[in-house]
Amino acid sequence: MQLYTYFFTFSLVLILALADQENKSLDFTQEGGIAKRGAFQFSYLIKKYTGRNPLDYWGYGCWCGLGGKGTPVDGVDWCCYHHDMCFNSITQGPRPTCSKNAPYHKNYYFSGLKCSTGWLTSKCGRAICACDIAAVKCFMRNHFNNKYQNYKKNIC
């Protein structure tokens, strides 16, 4: 399963990089619509509401991107920390809301910065959506500091 997660993450990064390189839109979904994969929805929300390329957050500080350790370096990094902890809370424990890999492929509905509570959205989808929306709102409140991009994780 870990290999699947790395492969999917690499594929997502490659797709986003190619879309940015060719100045194509990252709008994988329409507002209020549904994307092919949950990770695309998170990327869409980041782009739409922060104006930044989602890849800007990849490797930012100690917690953004794959894995995470140490103390977050600033507000944006704290957003990533809380996003990771949010996913942990819905995928771990005696009765998890979602399977371990669901946050990377489970679809959800949203409108603006609100998750849909309609019958088409599962309990897991709503939980993932809530984690993603909270992270995007956090990104919007915090200053993105370029010096923490591609941060050396070994000093975390």
Swiss-Prot record:
* UniProt: Ca(2+) binding residues: G65, G67, D84
Alphabetical list of InterPro entries matching this protein? PLipase_A2 (IPR001211), PLipase_A2_Asp_AS (IPR033112), PLipase_A2_dom (IPR016090), PLipase_A2_dom_sf (IPR036444), PLipase_A2_His_AS (IPR033113)
- Which residues form each disulfide bond in the chain? C62-C156, C64-C80, C79-C138, C86-C131, C115-C129
Propeptide, chain numbering: 20-35
Q: Where in the cell is it found?
A: Secreted; Nematocyst
> What is the annotated signal peptide range for this record?
1-19
Question: GO MF annotations for this entry?
Answer: calcium ion binding; calcium-dependent phospholipase A2 activity; phospholipid binding; toxin activity
Extract one GO BP annotation from the record: lipid catabolic process
Q: Which Pfam families match?
A: Phospholip_A2_1 (PF00068)
Entry annotated with the keyword Secreted: yes
Q: What does this protein do?
A: Sea anemone phospholipase A2 (PLA2) that may have a role both in defense and in digestion, since its expression and enzymatic activity were found both in the acontia (defensive organs) and tentacles. PLA2 catalyzes the calcium-dependent hydrolysis of the 2-acyl groups in 3-sn-phosphoglycerides.
Membership in a protein family:
Belongs to the phospholipase A2 family.
Quote the protein name from its UniProt record.
Phospholipase A2 A2-hormotoxin-Apt1a
The protein's organism comes out as Adamsia palliata
